[in-house]
């Protein structure tokens, strides 16, 4: 026997039992964003490597360590997309969606990062993202956050997630803060780890995101970003908070929240849960007013978020909030005799047409009646619909209950349709 080929490490199969959960999650996401007036956009999995270097930032873990990058046959460097925002901006610029226009867009699909695989974090993962363009005021920041709050309510997990907010201010305010932060960190070089020392000059705000407890200890007395915010950014953030307060959305202001990507400015936010063991981010986003221009378009305000679907599915399963999953088949259609076998798919088509949402699986592969009923039982169907030559001649079918202790019944086809409709709607 030939050696089996295994899936690539960190890239997982999604099997039939799990895909039903994913489909339910995806449907809720689609329905919710559609109710807010957002439109779907789809774009390639492979992009120019330069797109991510220019947008995410060259001195970031994603670009330095995690991207899947390769040269094609022309020698061009290409990358499997590690995130969606930069790709959405590229697609918007290239296709004329953003120039002097407002857009509300969403996307969903696989992303790729070469990280150490662990529960809820994989090398191929699925992301749901939402981006808005052309609106500079805080009301759109609030809408994006309120939309996420609506998602948690739809999933039934509102009590298990919490919102953290911060403002990074304007580029000028951030530059002033960077200078103050670097000056402070230079007084504590003996405490900083090598990673923090490297980031201190290339991207000092990322030091605030350090997981090293010694570094976190010295950051307690570090200069605060809020002390360096420009007046306009302060007003923008206050307006956002006022809108969230009015809507009853609870939040905590976390001045160390900076996000891991270089393109953010002003509003940044994360939705966090403690229900997956260690604290975990379920959804994160913010404002990135400079990115469209940075990638070759006209200066355009923008705000959005992304959420990892693997982690969301894990959270829903941990909290038992997935709800009822529709069974694979409601009816297993068994047949006895060649004539009945030929008529079986025709009768199945009639049932599917006349009984909305009815799922009918037709037996295939031959076998005696006992074997067919055994297959019916394994199919998870509620009933077996049985046809033989006698049933064909009389224009009837026999219904055998598979999950209830009820006597089987023989009915005319129209009566059977009514019974099956009642069965799946009860």
From Swiss-Prot:
Pfam name, any one? tRNA-synt_His
Q: Per the record's keyword annotation, is Mitochondrion included, yes or no?
A: no
A Gene Ontology cellular component where this protein is annotated is: cytoplasm
Q: Where in the cell is it found?
A: Cytoplasm
Question: Which Gene3D superfamilies does the entry mention?
Answer: Anticodon-binding domain, Bira Bifunctional Protein, Domain 2
SUPFAM superfamilies for this protein? Class II aaRS ABD-related (SSF52954), Class II aaRS and biotin synthetases (SSF55681)
Top-level taxon in the UniProt lineage: Bacteria
Keyword flag Protein biosynthesis: yes
Chief localization: cytoplasm
Q: Which family does it belong to?
A: Belongs to the class-II aminoacyl-tRNA synthetase family.
Q: Cross-referenced PANTHER family, in alphabetical order?
A: HISTIDINE--TRNA LIGASE, MITOCHONDRIAL-RELATED, HISTIDYL-TRNA SYNTHETASE
Subunit structure, per the record?
A: Homodimer.
Q: What is this protein called?
A: Histidine--tRNA ligase
Organism per entry: Pseudoalteromonas translucida (strain TAC 125)
- Gene designation per UniProt: hisS
């Amino acid at each position: 026997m030939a050696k089996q080929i295994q899936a690539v490490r960190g890239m997982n199969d999604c099997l039939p039992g799990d895909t039903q959960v994913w489909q339910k999650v995806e449907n809720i996401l689609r329905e919710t964003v559609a109710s807010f007036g957002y439109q779907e956009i789809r774009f390639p999995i492979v992009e120019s490597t330069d797109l991510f270097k220019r947008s995410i930032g060259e001195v970031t873990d994603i670009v330095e360590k995690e991207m899947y990058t390769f040269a094609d046959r022309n020698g061009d460097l290409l990358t499997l997309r590690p995130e969606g925002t930069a790709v959405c901006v590229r697609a918007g610029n290239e296709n004329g969606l953003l120039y002097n226009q407002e857009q509300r867009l969403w996307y969903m699909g696989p992303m790729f990062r070469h990280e150490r695989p662990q529960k809820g974090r994989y090398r191929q993962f699925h992301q749901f993202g939402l981006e808005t363009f052309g609106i500079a005021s805080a009301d759109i920041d609030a809408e994006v956050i309120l939309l996420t709050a609506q998602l948690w309510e739809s999933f039934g997990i509102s009590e298990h997630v919490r919102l953290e907010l911060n403002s990074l201010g304007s580029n000028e305010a951030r530059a002033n803060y960077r200078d103050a932060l670097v000056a402070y960190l230079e007084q504590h070089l003996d405490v900083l780890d090598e990673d923090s020392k490297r980031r201190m000059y290339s991207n000092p705000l990322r030091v605030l995101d350090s997981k090293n407890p010694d570094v976190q200890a010295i950051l307690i007395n570090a200069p605060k970003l809020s002390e360096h915010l420009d007046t306009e950014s302060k007003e923008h953030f206050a307006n956002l908070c006022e809108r969230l307060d009015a809507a009853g959305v609870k939040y905590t202001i976390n001045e160390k929240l900076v996000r891991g990507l270089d393109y953010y400015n002003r509003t940044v936010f994360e939705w966090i849960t403690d229900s997956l063991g260690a604290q975990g981010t379920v959804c994160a986003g913010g404002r990135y007013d400079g990115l469209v221009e940075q990638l070759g378009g006209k200066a355009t305000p923008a705000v959005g978020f992304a959420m990892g679907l693997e982690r969301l599915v894990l959270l829903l399963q941990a909290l038992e909030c997935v709800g009822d999953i529709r069974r694979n088949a409601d009816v297993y259609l068994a047949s006895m005799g060649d004539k009945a076998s030929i008529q079986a798919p025709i009768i199945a088509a009639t049932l599917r047409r006349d009984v909305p949402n009815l799922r009918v699986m037709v037996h295939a592969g031959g076998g005696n009646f006992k074997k067919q009923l055994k297959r019916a039982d394994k199919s998870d169907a509620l009933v077996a619909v049985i046809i033989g030559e006698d049933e064909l001649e009389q224009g009837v079918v026999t219904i055998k209950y598979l999950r209830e202790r009820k006597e089987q019944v023989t009915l005319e086809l129209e009566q059977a349709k009514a019974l099956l409709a009642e069965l799946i709607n009860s």
